[in-house]
């Protein structure tokens, strides 16, 4: 398992250990054997993926001559060192996928509305390296993806990289969904994703818009007509009875 800088165990397994990586790769291999055409890793949970386990600390000491347990979590050397273990796992997943042609790797990442690279500084996901080595096919960023970061990744990955930002918050008006989709498309997104999609359609008008967001030519119309989707009207009577004071318990 992972360990804090005081040596206290953490419940999550550490990718610093080859045996742990092989365990996860074994599960992924079993999944692929059912005929799936790819793998998606949710890297916005249980991050970062190594902490202060013995091999991590020893390798850092050998490289920098310093104990990382006394450093800030934001120390650039520590972030780079920690990220290297996850990158190694991503390489191994890519190698597994490439045993057969046309299998894709998607990753879900954490993003910040203010453009701060939380995926790297906090979660130690070295996305630039993954793109540069051609390891990933899909980037799905939640809850927000700043336009500048989207454009940066697009410049690194070109058209072959799929970048699908999440549409947050979960509950929005139809017009709000369409405006957000337009903003991401203009920045270079080629698709969109919905984290917790099964909990998104609190109102039928939302789904009436969301189901069309992949059709860019419809977005202006959604913005214009969205406020009129499935309007509700308050009933004053039902079956001849006053609704306000009827149909109560007892």
Predicted segments with their positions:
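Aromatic- and acidic-residue-enriched carbohydrate-binding clefts of CAZyme catalytic domains
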Residues: 1-14, 47-84, 224
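Active-site-adjacent "subsite" loops/lids of carbohydrate-active enzymes
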Residues: 1-34
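Aromatic-lined carbohydrate-recognition surfaces of secreted/lumenal glycan-active proteins
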Residues: 28, 40-47, 75-121, 160-170
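Substrate-binding cleft/loops of secretory-pathway carbohydrate-active enzymes
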Residues: 99, 103-149, 172-173, 180-181
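Substrate-binding cleft of secreted/luminal carbohydrate-active enzymes
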Residues: 135-149, 168-240
């Amino acid at each position: 398992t992972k360990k804090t800088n005081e040596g206290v165990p953490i419940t999550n397994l550490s990718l610093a250990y080859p045996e742990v990586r092989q365990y996860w790769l074994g599960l992924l291999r079993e999944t692929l054997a059912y005929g799936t055409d790819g793998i998606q890793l949710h890297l916005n949970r249980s991050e970062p993926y190594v902490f202060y386990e013995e091999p991590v600390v020893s390798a850092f000491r050998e490289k920098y001559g310093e104990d990382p347990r006394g450093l800030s979590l934001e120390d650039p050397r520590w972030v780079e060192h920690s990220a290297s273990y996850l990158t190694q796992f991503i390489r191994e997943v890519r190698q597994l996928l490439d045993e057969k042609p046309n299998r894709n790797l998607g990753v879900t990442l954490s993003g910040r509305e203010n453009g701060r690279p939380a995926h790297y500084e906090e979660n130690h996901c070295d996305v630039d390296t993954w793109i540069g080595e051609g390891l990933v096919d899909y980037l799905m960023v939640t809850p927000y993806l700043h336009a500048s970061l989207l454009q940066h990744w697009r410049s690194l990955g070109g058209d072959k990289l799929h970048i699908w930002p999440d549409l947050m918050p979960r509950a929005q008006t139809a017009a709000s969904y369409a405006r957000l989709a337009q903003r991401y498309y203009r920045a270079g997104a080629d698709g969109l994703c919905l984290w917790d999609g099964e909990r998104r359609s609190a109102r039928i008008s939302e789904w009436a818009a969301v189901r069309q967001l992949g059709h860019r030519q419809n977005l202006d119309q959604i913005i214009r007509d969205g406020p009129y989707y499935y309007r509700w009207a308050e009933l004053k009577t039902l079956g001849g009875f006053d609704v306000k004071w009827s149909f109560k318990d007892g």
